[in-house]
Amino acid sequence: MVSLDIVRKFNGSLSSRLPRPVALFVGGTSGIGRSTLRQLALNTNAPTAYVVGRSESNARPLLKELGQLNPLGSFKFIEADVSLIRNVDKICEGIKTREKSLDLLFMTPGGLSLVGRRETSEGLDKLFALRYYSRIRFAQKLMPLLEAAEPAPGRVVSVLGGGFEGNINPDDLDLKKGYHILSCAMHSVTMTSLAMEHLAASRRASFVHVYPGLVGTNIYTNSFPSPLAAVYNYGMWPLMYPFSVNIDESGERHLFHATSERYPSNTIGNDRRLAARGELDPAIGSNGTFGSGAYLMNWKGDTSEAGKKMQKLRKEGMTERVWEHTTNLLDRTVR
């Protein structure tokens, strides 16, 4: 476990470690994304942060607060439905015209759903698109900017379920036939980890897949009808609260996950002399090697190899198969 004291010490040094960072927060207007964005504003010097969300009017109080926390910062809102891949491409093209590099891509879009498959106008399930396809598309399209970041390569953080990988159906990866709540969750989590491993092997960027733990956010209020949300908020949450992570601490820890030298890219992690410049040794990557560039992480900053199931998937060639499926499907979607 990375102690909270270490997290705070590191975050407090970011003004000198990471001068004038450029970041994109997808889903940054509430919950963990919002909390992490606030910590970025508090701990960095003159950041530029693009914030993608569904409602500009709802985001105005946040943008005002960020400006007060960091008057030298630039905080720009982009209103978009990122369940549509075409919108993702449009956002990425806009950022590439404005920026030469990107230090951080931080993604939390999604939510919960008790209903079945709901297809977007592009033929993807909406929740699956938010949890997996759109996130990978952002990483894919913004890779040139992430690789151009200095002094350290850029980092991609996807907050979902790192370390909870499991079985997926290789003949129904997009769940056109066998969609249900659990299959969507398992495919989203496992395919994210496999796709990140694929990217980390050859890219000058690092990839972090985080399970955030139990955090007090408005996810149930935003995802479910009022009666059901009330059952959770007033009936279940009080029982779960003692085991939860405070939303402010979650933001502090996720900023550490997003910027610490503990999770370097493959190009740095393999060079222990470069990695040693940081105060913390490189973490074990998802494939079992130090500094591999892809990391499966819990809320405390501990990393795992995801055990026998990921090993089995690698042996079966699922890393390459998932990546090929993903790129082909995304390209077909926007034709």
Sequence positions of predicted segments:
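Glycine-rich NAD(P)-binding loop of the Rossmann-fold in SDR/ketoreductase-type enzymes
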Residues: 83, 126-134, 187, 245
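Amphipathic alpha-helical dimer-interface segment in Rossmann-like NAD(P)H-dependent oxidoreductases
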Residues: 130-150, 197-201
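NAD(P)H-dependent oxidoreductase Rossmann-fold/reductase module
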Residues: 2-78, 94, 171-335
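Active-site loop of short-chain dehydrogenase/reductase
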Residues: 102, 146-168, 204-206
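A glycine-rich helix->loop->beta "capping" turn
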Residues: 71-76, 93-107, 111-119
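Short alpha-helical oligomerization interface
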Residues: 113-131, 177-178
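Rossmann-fold scaffold of SDR-type NAD(P)-dependent oxidoreductases
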Residues: 26, 100-110, 157-160, 208
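The beta1-alpha1 cofactor-binding region of Rossmann-like NAD(H)/NADP(H)-dependent oxidoreductases
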Residues: 57, 79-90
